[in-house]
Amino acid sequence: MSNFTAKVPLSERMADVLISKDRWKDDEEGYLKVKYGLEIILINVMKFAIVYGIALVTGLLLQTVTVHLSYLWLRRYSFGLHATKTLNCTLISLTMFVLAPFIFQNIPSNNWIVLGTFAFILLNMFLFAPADTESLPLIGEEHRKKLKRKAMIGTLILTGIALLIPFAEMKTLIMVGSLFQVISINPLTYKLLKRRYRNYEKYE
């Protein structure tokens, strides 16, 4: 294998194989857009396979799904940080969605803990959601206000689910996933990772 090939990411090499460049010879920009989109899909598929494959093998599938869905439910409207490198993203995902469920799976929580935790989460959604990134600035004040409202409503809905669910350990896992999302929108996290906060200000 040549040094050049070794340095090209697997997702990019797979995208090159799946897309015939000859078909796009008259539209280089279109080719690059399609290739980039396919790379993103391949990266996410591979990351999903790694995370859920390990969760399945270790008997943590339900716990992983619970933490992941709670995280995604809030992230849908509150956005937040993304890892800048695929390897970092995969390692963070394994920590959040496999290691954390393993650690917290047998820790029960009662509804008082749920109320206290989600009050903290709701406050963070009010103060910091939505949080953008350098590659995805959230432009438009009205747009951001709508996202904030939806993020807060989503938090209240998830609070209700956590309160009503009869399994004490499941309550804990829902809170863990939700707190991961709080970390991703908190300005302190941006500062610690030396990432730019309020990226929309550059365009408004």
UniProtKB/Swiss-Prot annotation:
Belongs to the AgrB family. May be involved in the proteolytic processing of a quorum sensing system signal molecule precursor. One of its GO terms (molecular function) is peptidase activity. It is found in: Cell membrane. InterPro entries: AgrB (IPR006741). One of its GO terms (cellular component) is plasma membrane. Keywords: Cell membrane, Hydrolase, Membrane, Protease, Quorum sensing, Transmembrane, Transmembrane helix. This is Putative AgrB-like protein. It comes from the Bacteria. Its EC number is 3.4.-.-. Its main location: membrane. GO terms for biological process: proteolysis; quorum sensing. It is a multi-pass membrane protein. NCBIfam families: PRK01100.1.
